[in-house]
């Protein structure tokens, strides 16, 4: 009789799905790497094909999720002007696409020029202006996405949705996703969450979830120790040490491996 596989061991079906996803990601990367067409000709196709890669619904013709969403800017002098969001999903994101020219050397080395970075910063400011111009009834989306088609995707988040500044997500060092990084399942999962549940990426919610899980584990540990005959006072002292140790690890007070 064949021994059962340990829990968590991938099944042949799981492996096949993973292989298919990896193959699809590599095909997407190859398809879009260094694409030279104009912004208008490529931005919508890029979004549609990215949606297919991530397994999410592409934009529709409905105003809550569409390409070229009309926006009206209200100016201080009472005048108005019109704009259009490249791609908009209510409660999820404002998406601004560009087609810049990072240069051949930048493409090879993965570096970018100041002019390229400045252009993306300008695109970010444009996207934030769109987010602030949305009707109050719709609220502001938690994410602003800035894309240089065929090169990078930048994520900026403002989870309070109160009009505060959108900041690099998850941090200034890794908010820029290069096209080749779409081969990473974790990166694809992050992008997928923009469509399915953007607020699930809120660090405060993740921390609260972890805190609740830890509290539940410690409560069960306390019950088991007391059930085993340990007095409440030593149990409480032990759990306090556990909490302090976790805190010390989180803030870097404990030495890491090899130090």
What are these model-predicted stretches?
Residues 60, 71, 173, 181-183, ...:
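Solvent-exposed, flexible loop/coil residues
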Residues 54-60, 248-259:
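Short helix-capping/linker segments at secondary-structure and domain boundaries
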């Amino acid at each position: 009789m064949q021994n059962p596989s340990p829990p968590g061991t991938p099944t042949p079906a799981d492996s096949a799905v993973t292989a298919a996803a990896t193959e699809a990601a590599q095909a997407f990367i190859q398809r879009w790497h260094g694409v030279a067409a104009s912004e208008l000709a490529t931005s919508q196709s890029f979004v549609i094909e990215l949606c297919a890669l991530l397994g999410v619904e592409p934009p529709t013709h409905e105003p809550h999720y569409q390409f070229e969403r009309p926006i009206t800017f209200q100016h201080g002098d009472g005048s108005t002007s019109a704009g259009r969001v490249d791609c908009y999903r209510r409660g999820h994101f404002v998406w601004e696409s560009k087609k810049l020219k990072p240069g051949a050397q930048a493409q090879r080395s993965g570096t970018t020029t100041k002019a390229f970075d400045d252009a993306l910063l300008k695109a970010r400011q444009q996207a934030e202006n769109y987010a602030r111009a949305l009707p109050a009834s719709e609220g502001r989306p938690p994410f602003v996405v800035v894309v240089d088609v065929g090169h990078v995707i930048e994520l900026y988040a403002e989870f309070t949705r109160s009009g505060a500044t959108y900041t690099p997500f998850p941090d200034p060092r890794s908010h820029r996703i290069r096209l080749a990084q779409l081969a990473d399942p974790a990166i694809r999962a992050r992008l997928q969450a923009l469509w399915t549940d953007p607020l699930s990426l809120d660090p405060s919610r993740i921390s609260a979830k972890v805190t609740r899980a830890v509290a539940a584990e410690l409560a069960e540990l306390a019950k088991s120790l007391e059930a085993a005959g340990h007095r409440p006072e030593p149990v409480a002292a032990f759990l306090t040490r556990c909490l302090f140790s976790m805190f010390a690890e989180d803030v870097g007070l404990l030495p890491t491996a090899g130090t």
